Amino acid sequence: MEIDKNVDTLSEGQVDELIKKNIIMTSLEAVFNWARGNSLWPLSSGLACCAIEMMATGASRFDMARFGYEVFRPSPRQADLIIIAGTLTWKMAPAIQRVYEQMPEPKWIIAMGSCACTGGPFADSYAVVPGVDKVIPVDVYVPGCPPRPEALLDGFLKLKAKIQNPAKVGLKHGK
């Protein structure tokens, strides 16, 4: 369709076509959620054997950098995601809670492995927290003992979808 550059001569249908092809209508919140979902800065909390699989996820074979998640942060003040990987004990729980409180908003949590999700084989122990969600809120659970790097990548993608589409999962403003 040939469109005249003079706006005065455009019909309503031509204007609608130009809008569909050249203008993106969105909200600033949607842009922020898109950016947040594509550039998560994780803080690793490797408490057991799941940490080895988390390290493998960052290696070249699985390349989590292609999703924008390669920048593991050393400080909770710089991170927006904690990956709790492994067994959480009641003695360690206050430290994890303190780290969670030090993170800026919005913040997300991935529970990686059976131990982090439910306490795993140690759930009946007096010293083990039967799931990280008893201490801090969890956004995505990655089951397995230990979960493969592909499962952690799937967890990242599920979290990305949750961040970018907060209305679909009942969130307000991404959290």
From Swiss-Prot:
Entry note: cofactor: Binds 1 [4Fe-4S] cluster.
Domain of life assignment: Bacteria
Essential cofactor(s): [4Fe-4S] cluster
Documented EC number(s): 7.1.1.-
Principal location class: membrane
Keywords on record: 4Fe-4S, Cell membrane, Iron, Iron-sulfur, Membrane, Metal-binding, NAD, Quinone, Translocase, Transport
Enzyme class, broadest EC rank: translocase
Binding residues for [4Fe-4S] cluster: 49-50, 115, 145
Alphabetical list of PROSITE patterns matching this protein: COMPLEX1_20K
One Pfam family cited in the UniProt record for this chain: Oxidored_q6
Entry's Gene Ontology cellular component terms: plasma membrane; respiratory chain complex I
Membrane topology, from the record: Peripheral membrane protein
Name of the protein described by the UniProt record: NADH-quinone oxidoreductase subunit B
Organism listed in the record: Heliobacterium modesticaldum (strain ATCC 51547 / Ice1)
The organism's taxonomic lineage, starting at the top: Bacteria, Bacillati, Bacillota, Clostridia, Eubacteriales
Gene name of the record: nuoB
